[in-house]
Regions:
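Bacterial N-terminal signal peptides
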Residues: 9-20
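Sec-dependent signal peptide cleavage junction
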Residues: 18-28, 622-630, 650
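Cellulosome-associated attachment modules in secreted, modular CAZymes
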Residues: 476, 628, 634-639
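Extracellular modular ligand-binding repeats in secreted and cell-surface proteins
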Residues: 503-591
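Bacterial N-terminal signal peptides that target proteins for export
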Residues: 1-9
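C-terminal low-complexity, Ser/Thr- and acidic/Pro-rich disordered "stalk" regions positioned immediately N-terminal
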Residues: 582-627
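C-terminal membrane-anchoring or membrane-association module
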Residues: 635-653
């Protein structure tokens, strides 16, 4: 009796567990099915025996039939039987399946597949599952587990839907391409891989459909042997007229196969409905054909990026190309890196980096850059070409035409304003057009035209020189850095403004006897002083000495080195003391002490000369050998003699 009670309690506990197992979003009850160990028959959701009129699922020799939309079928174990959904004619009702370590060798199939059937498949957290195929008119795959399959898709026409969120899905495509129909969305943290093993694209999105990647979702369209040449055209992601859109931090990677006939090399991504890469999304495409062969292409967002590589065609071929708001295209091709069948536009913050065998960027329409940075390096041909006009504003263009062609060429007009053009052309002319308020380098020799302002963090190469002519000016843009490792000759005006200057190589200026030269660009002293260059030489005129003040000879004094020179060329250095003329001594009055003007009416019997030369009287001549200074006392004495003689004659009369 106790054994029977224990068994009964165990059965009741199992039923309660089944009824209380967490379910999908609607909180539905869960029907636990071990697909490997269930006998044939009708079963209710709790696993008890049912009938043909009230069963939840039915086990047959070749099938496991699921008939209810108001439960969650949680499948575990391995089976070769087909898990078949008995289709509901109510498209609003979804069949809910949770995979929890299940291996379904024949996949999940739809009975009466012509109806619009909604199927929601959840992968239990941490579980690994294998399902041969998952297909429905409206299919959702979710959860924190993984599923391996040979086919996953939405069936039907444009009204079909596919949504993969969070789950990890790997599809090894054994034959024809896997196919999406209608609106297809991959989002959350989903990681989806399609790997082709035959000569077909891993994934196709049919006409009238669309594919959108959001959040942090990742999609890979790969081949198990991508370098093996096929006998026909084999793409990576083939979308025909369907539109491709990437948002958030989503990621797409696609590759194509080469062909034994190079004219039919596969393209990595084909979407004539257009491609939008937005926000922080990224696309990586590689092929022998085009990396991307698409309709209108837009790359917009600070982290939005396309990396496209073609070994035998164009990296990007598009009906039109727009890169803006910080978007990036990094493309390479053996033909063009970018071939636009219409216009090409690079807007604010755009970065375009191109390497190619032929022309790096070819636009059948107009080519415009406004606030962009474009680097273009072709092995031959021009760097940038437009059949229309080229209009460059507030942009930096680094273009290298290595084969003798112009760096920039157009059949229409070429204009550039407030831009930085770093061009190289062995033909001698980097660009011919109307250039205003810009910096233009041609083969590393640059000049500033008008009033230029930098628009990105520009760099002057070690082998380059830049001249700012008189009347021209260069200002570093707000928040930007100008990095100089070349030679800059400032004849006009340079201003750091609200930017910064990193000067790695100083040039210009003149060294003086007191200091090394000042860099033309940053005004930093560098090098060593020049002892022969007395830039601060002051001329001092000669001044005669007087009894009141000293005089000086003519000389030149340098305030830079505090030296004195006898000539204007500063070749003959002299001592400062030798420039000084001594002050003259004071002169005593001539005659006796009575103050008589020299007359001898008082009977004076001595001549003035005798008095002056009286023994013991010191000479009044200066000690120096200056002839002028020595003659002054003699002239005074002679004048005295004349006066006395005149007085004597008068008295005789």
């Amino acid at each position: 009796m106790s054994k029977r009670l224990a068994a009964l309690f165990a059965m009741l506990f199992a039923v309660l567990v089944c009824l209380q197992t967490p379910a999908l979003a609607d909180g539905l009850p869960v029907a636990m099915i071990d697909v490997a160990n269930t006998a044939n028959g009708y079963y209710k959701a709790d696993g008890s025996e049912g009938t043909s009129s009230d069963y939840c699922y039915k086990i047959e020799d070749a099938r496991i039939l699921l008939s209810k939309t108001d439960v969650v079928y949680e499948l575990t174990g391995l089976t070769n039987k087909s898990v078949t959904i008995i289709n509901s004619s109510k498209p609003t009702d979804a069949f809910n399946i949770r995979l929890n370590g299940a291996t379904l060798s024949d996949g999940i199939n739809i009975q009466n597949s012509g109806y619009f059937t909604r199927v929601s498949v959840e992968t239990a957290a941490g579980s690994s599952n294998t399902v041969n195929k998952l297909i429905a008119r409206d299919l959702t795959i979710s959860g924190a587990g993984s599923v391996n399959a040979q086919y996953v898709g939405s069936s039907g026409g444009a009204d079909a839907k596919l949504h993969i969120t969070d789950a990890k899905v790997t599809v090894n495509v054994p034959t024809n391409s896997n196919e999406f129909n209608g609106a297809c969305v991959i989002d959350g943290s989903a990681e989806v891989r399609f790997i082709a093993t035959k000569d077909y694209a891993p994934l196709q999105v049919e006409n009238g459909g669309s594919l959108t990647l959001k959040d942090g979702a990742k999609l890979y369209c790969l081949h198990d042997n991508p370098n093996l040449a096929s006998g026909s055209y084999v793409a990576g992601l083939e979308m025909f007229s369907a539109k491709l859109r990437l948002e958030g931090n989503s990621y797409l990677e696609a590759e194509a196969r080469p062909c034994t006939n190079p004219d039919y090399n596969g393209d990595a991504i084909v979407s004539y409905g257009g491609v939008d890469v937005l926000d922080n999304a990224k696309v990586v495409a590689r092929a022998n054909g085009a990396g991307l062969n698409v309709g209108a292409l837009t790359v917009s967002g600070e982290g939005a990026r396309i990396d496209a590589e073609s070994k035998a065609a164009s990296g990007v071929a598009a009906d039109s190309v727009t890169v803006e708001n910080g978007g990036t295209i990094d493309a390479s091709g053996s033909w063009q890196a970018i071939y636009s069948r219409g216009d090409f536009k690079a807007g604010a913050g755009a970065f375009v980096n191109l390497e190619s065998g032929g022309c790096a960027l070819w636009a059948e329409g107009n080519l415009a850059a406004d606030g962009a940075l474009i680097q273009a390096v072709p092995n031959k041909d021009v760097a940038l070409f437009s059949k229309g006009d080229v209009d460059i504003k507030k942009s930096t263009i680094i273009a290298r035409a290595e084969s003798g062609d112009e760096a920039i060429r157009a059949r229409g007009d070429i204009t550039a304003n407030l831009s930085w053009l770093d061009l190289k052309s062995t033909s001698g002319e980097g660009v011919t057009g109307t250039i205003t308020n810009s910096v233009v380098f041609n083969n590393n020799v640059g000049t500033v035209i008008g009033d230029a302002v930098t628009n990105v963090n520009n760099f002057i190469d070690r082998n380059a020189s830049l001249t700012i002519p008189e009347g021209a000016s260069l200002i570093v843009g707000d928040g930007l850095d100008l990095r100089n490792d070349g030679v800059v000759n400032v004849l006009g005006t340079f201003n750091v403004g609200n930017g910064t200057l990193t000067c790695l190589n100083h040039s210009g200026g003149l060294a003086t006897c007191a200091a090394g030269p000042l860099c033309d660009l940053c005004q930093t002293e560098y090098g060593v002083p020049d002892p022969t260059n007395h830039a601060h030489l002051e001329h001092v005129e000669a001044k005669a000495a007087t009894t009141e003040a000293e005089g000086n000879i003519e000389y030149w004094a340098c305030s830079g080195c505090s030296k004195y020179f006898a000539d204007a060329a500063a070749r003959e250095e002299i001592e400062q003391a030798s420039t000084v003329l001594a002050k003259l001594p004071e002169q005593k009055p001539a005659g006796n002490n009575s103050g008589n003007g020299g007359g001898n009416d008082n009977g004076g019997d001595k001549k003035p000369q005798q008095a002056a030369n009286k023994k013991g009287t010191k000479s009044q001549l200066p000690a120096t050998g200056d002839a002028l200074n020595a003659a002054l006392p003699l002239a005074a004495a002679l004048a005295g003699v004349i006066v006395i003689a005149s007085g004597f004659v008068v008295s005789k009369r």
